[in-house]
Amino acid sequence: MTDSQVRGAVVPPRAEITPETFDRAHGTTAKSELMWRMAREAYGADYPEELQAWGMTTWWTLGRFISGLRISTGQHLVDLACGRGGVGLWLARATGAQLTGVDWSPAGVREAAARAGEFVPAHRASFIVGDLAATGLAPASADAAVCADAVFFALDRVAVFAEMARVLRPGARFVFTADESDDPASPAAVPDWEPIVEAGGLVVESREEIPRWREDLQGMYDTWLANISELRQGLGDESADDLVQEATLVGPTLAHRTGVLYTTRRR
């Protein structure tokens, strides 16, 4: 079953979202202190600065990841769409888990591997290039999986959850953050992730709305746009244009969006 066959499922995301876009983000852009300074300004005390996470990850989100995943020392955690690895590495350190990060951006994977030693011993983390719906991991090899703000990038969202159902051991949990939207004008809006999750073979255990998700994200976009000259000078036009595009395209739609955190489980 694909997206188009599930009630509430949607068409693929914008075609211009590519691995190359994320290579710029995880490479040139992420190496600038500008981005993390602006994130601190937007999120304030809720921002876990050490992670340098691209997603809208807060201390609240990290706490829910810990409680939802229920993973312990020596177990295998998968960080799906890991980017530069901040979320997965923090969780591996906090829980004692063995981490595998998967991302479609080679630059993100390289940066995650380079940062790993800041969080855990070298043997506790590995990172591979792979797709949201085709990780390359062995069946039933993971005790838990997490994905921060990325499942919506998949061309076939159902396939993401089917891949998690394949990779997770029976009873293991997959916790992810995303947004839901009631905007009838947006062909890429997901009004409800539950039917997509279940079509992929997982069970929804809980859905929570992320506190201040809309306000904090708008604050970050406003900060980017207010400092665009500094961003152009520090990052270059191409990377700055990526940020402007996101802020100007997504910002006006936030009134229709709700940030959500789902805890799901393999049967």
Question: Can you name each region flagged by the protein language model?
Answer:
Residues 1-46:
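N-terminal, positively charged/glycine-rich alpha-helical extensions of SAM-dependent methyltransferases
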Residues 133-145:
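A short acidic, Gly/Pro-enriched loop at the edge of an enzyme's catalytic core
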Residues 144-156:
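A short SAM/SAH-binding and catalytic strip from SAM-dependent methyltransferases
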Residues 158-170:
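A short glycine-rich, Lys/Arg-flanked "PGG" loop and its adjoining helix->strand segment in the class I
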Residues 172-179:
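Conserved beta-strand signature within the Rossmann-like core of class I S-adenosyl-L-methionine
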Residues 208-267:
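Conserved Class I S-adenosyl-L-methionine
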